[in-house]
Amino acid sequence: MSKGIVLLAAGGTGGHVFPAEALAFKLKERGYSVHLVTDSRAERFAGKFPAEEIHVVPSATIGSKNPVAVARSLWTLWSGMRAAKKLIQRLKPVIVVGFGGYPTVPPLLAATRLGIASMLHEQNAVMGRANKALAPRVKAIAGGFLQESGDVFSDKTVATGNPVRPAILAAAEQPYHPSHPGEPFNLVVFGGSQGAQYFSKAMPTAISLLDDELRARLRVTQQVRPEDMEMVRGCVAQLQMGADIAPFFNDMAERLAKAHLVICRSGASTVSEISVIGRPAVLVPYPHALDHDQAANAAALAATGGAKVIVQSELSPERIASILSHVMNDPEKLSHMAAAAKLAGKPDAANLLADMVEAIAAGKTVSEFKRTRA
């Protein structure tokens, strides 16, 4: 018999959906039924989500200064709140947990108005806009990189870390095996669940600048946006090198486990996953993030020695080629980085977050939960 329904709400990108998925698996193991509220974008990422049902509720972000656009967004949000209220009244969840992104706003607002226990999980070192708007209303906040002190919401914040999916935990069991000169070198390049156009343009040029011996060693996995596929495949064909190019990889965990180096953006889920697996990385924060959250996430891992952070404006193809030339001939350096990344990982974050969800659902305060952890 189910202990009750937990309703999870997450924006439709991998950065929001993947940690929600990790929590869902833990809650299912503990006897709960899980439902997910998200948007249509999540279809690519929610294939393995262990939800009884996935619900799409109208939502919108208010990012425009156009009065007509703002009015439409407010109408959509109001419609979403009505739909979320009906959904919550039907499901009667024991708690509603939001993972950020604008699709979380209607169900969390509805839950707080209906008196249902509610909490947030913030993946980043800087709280996103949706979570920031909801934070005063919810009972508790779990943080991936948030601190438990020095913030207006610190009295109800617990630093749980970011939960990672079972596939990542399985990959973490594989030790790092360095690539020595003359041996194949697995390079994984990606820009988060939605890809990164910058890497599509920079990486082929960088690889073309390597000497023949190094290029022959490379085995590249690169995530590429659909609109860039033809261009990147053409470049790879000209270079006559081994490469897997795709808009999305369902087996990314296994590819990360085999990687000798990762070059990627620094979204919270990405940083958490590569640290749990323990792989050396060059992190390139997304330069147009409103709150510079990726820069803060990257700095957290770089401080441990597990990653090197380079801002995009300073990362030319020539510099990428130079980095590859050095590290491909320095397996000891990469091994040290891999070990440092592994030490920074929080593989038990999903268990801790599930403990917190159960505590808040049972009516405990954050202070009471913290005392049980002490």
From Swiss-Prot:
Q: In which pathway does it act?
A: Cell wall biogenesis; peptidoglycan biosynthesis
Q: Which residues bind UDP-N-acetyl-alpha-D-glucosamine?
A: 13-15, 124, 165, 193, 294
Topological relation to the membrane, as annotated:
Peripheral membrane protein
Return the EC number: 2.4.1.227
Residues passing through the membrane, by range: none
User: In the record, what terms sit under GO molecular function?
Assistant: UDP-N-acetyl-D-glucosamine:N-acetylmuramoyl-L-alanyl-D-glutamyl-meso-2,6-diaminopimelyl-D-alanyl-D-alanine-diphosphoundecaprenol 4-beta-N-acetylglucosaminlytransferase activity; undecaprenyldiphospho-muramoylpentapeptide beta-N-acetylglucosaminyltransferase activity
Query: In the UniProt record, does the keyword Nucleotide-binding occur?
Result: no
The reaction(s) annotated as catalysed by this protein in its Swiss-Prot or TrEMBL entry are: di-trans,octa-cis-undecaprenyl diphospho-N-acetyl-alpha-D-muramoyl-L-alanyl-D-glutamyl-meso-2,6-diaminopimeloyl-D-alanyl-D-alanine + UDP-N-acetyl-alpha-D-glucosamine = di-trans,octa-cis-undecaprenyl diphospho-[N-acetyl-alpha-D-glucosaminyl-(1->4)]-N-acetyl-alpha-D-muramoyl-L-alanyl-D-glutamyl-meso-2,6-diaminopimeloyl-D-alanyl-D-alanine + UDP + H(+)
What keyword terms does UniProt attach to this protein?
Cell cycle, Cell division, Cell inner membrane, Cell membrane, Cell shape, Cell wall biogenesis/degradation, Glycosyltransferase, Membrane, Peptidoglycan synthesis, Transferase
Query: Superkingdom, according to UniProt?
Result: Bacteria
Query: Which terms in the GO cellular component ontology are assigned?
Result: plasma membrane
Q: Which InterPro entries did the record assign?
A: GlcNAc_MurG, Glyco_trans_28_C, GlycoTrans_28_N
Q: Where in the cell is it found?
A: Cell inner membrane
Asked whether the UniProt record includes Isomerase among its keywords, one would answer no
Top class in the EC scheme: transferase
Gene Ontology terms: biological process: carbohydrate metabolic process; cell division; cell wall organization; lipid glycosylation; peptidoglycan biosynthetic process; regulation of cell shape
Give the protein's biological function.
Cell wall formation. Catalyzes the transfer of a GlcNAc subunit on undecaprenyl-pyrophosphoryl-MurNAc-pentapeptide (lipid intermediate I) to form undecaprenyl-pyrophosphoryl-MurNAc-(pentapeptide)GlcNAc (lipid intermediate II).
- Family to which this protein belongs: Belongs to the glycosyltransferase 28 family. MurG subfamily.
Q: Which NCBIfam families match?
A: murG
PANTHER family cross-referenced by the UniProt entry: GLYCOSYLTRANSFERASE (PTHR21015:SF22), UDP-N-ACETYLGLUCOSAMINE--N-ACETYLMURAMYL-(PENTAPEPTIDE) PYROPHOSPHORYL-UNDECAPRENOL N-ACETYLGLUCOSAMINE TRANSFERASE 1 (PTHR21015)
The protein here is known as UDP-N-acetylglucosamine--N-acetylmuramyl-(pentapeptide) pyrophosphoryl-undecaprenol N-acetylglucosamine transferase
